[in-house]
Swiss-Prot record:
UniProt family annotation: Belongs to the LeuD family. LeuD type 1 subfamily.
Species assigned in the record: Salmonella choleraesuis (strain SC-B67)
The protein's role, per its UniProt record: Catalyzes the isomerization between 2-isopropylmalate and 3-isopropylmalate, via the formation of 2-isopropylmaleate.
GO biological process, alphabetically ordered: L-leucine biosynthetic process
One annotated GO molecular function: 3-isopropylmalate dehydratase activity
EC number: 4.2.1.33
Chemical reaction(s) catalysed: (2R,3S)-3-isopropylmalate = (2S)-2-isopropylmalate
Name of the molecule in the record: 3-isopropylmalate dehydratase small subunit 2
Gene3D superfamilies per UniProt: Aconitase, domain 4 (3.20.19.10)
Length: 208
């Protein structure tokens, strides 16, 4: 997983509420688990027209917002079914951060596991950011995870994130990798636990 410390890039506004995972990654792109080529599926029904040509009216196809690093999203972004393909696709498309008011819980967790930062801001801050994101002349921002700040052309906006989430994103580790650093302590606890309560330990299976 890629690290996230300080990243600069353009932010694209997608402020519609309740954009669900079926919109982010349509079902026809869920067939594999190898994570290959999922960037093509992101917002497929909006990015492309019936004949497969790019939709010129979709924000991520417009010159000032192509290859956007951040998305400014509406409330309850990522709702719907739990499909990690949606997050994999966003990451492959180059999205490193989502800024909004609220995110669906499972989707938010999937972003955390895959190196995409989610930031929740209050409505006044989102409104100011939306005004800047709407113009290609002012839609460049810098997000510092170390300082928990978003720097725009006009101001610096502070945000709050849990220390555990910040630390894991900063070093590029998911929950499994983060837990493995405590393996010696876990093993020591297990030995001590079963030495005091041996009746809790399951006998070895005869099948190995």
């Amino acid at each position: 997983m890629d690290t996230f410390k300080q990243i600069s890039g353009r932010i694209a506004p997608m402020l519609e509420p309740n954009i669900d995972t079926d919109v982010i990654m349509p079902k026809q792109f869920l067939k594999g688990i190898d994570r290959q080529g999922l960037d093509k599926g992101v917002f497929f029904d909006r990015r492309f027209m019936a004949g497969g040509q790019p939709n010129p009216d979709f924000i991520l196809n417009m010159p000032g917002w192509q290859s956007a690093t951040f998305l400014l999203v509406g409330p309850n972004f990522g709702c719907g079914s739990s499909r990690e393909h949606a997050v994999w696709g966003l990451k492959q498309l180059g999205v490193r951060g989502l800024i909004g008011s609220t995110f669906a819980g499972i989707f938010d967790d999937n972003c955390q596991r895959n190196g995409i930062l989610t930031v929740s801001l209050d409505e006044p801050a989102l409104a100011r950011l939306a005004q800047l994101a709407a113009s290609a002349d002012t839609n460049s921002i810098t997000v510092s995870l170390d300082r928990c700040e978003i720097t725009t052309a006009e101001e610096t906006i502070s945000f709050v994130i849990s220390e555990l989430k910040r630390a894991m994103l900063a070093v590029g580790e998911d929950a499994i990798a983060w837990t493995l650093q405590y393996l010696p302590e876990i093993e020591n606890f297990e030995v001590a636990h079963y030495s005091r309560r041996p009746w809790l330990k399951r006998p070895a299976s005869p099948l190995g």
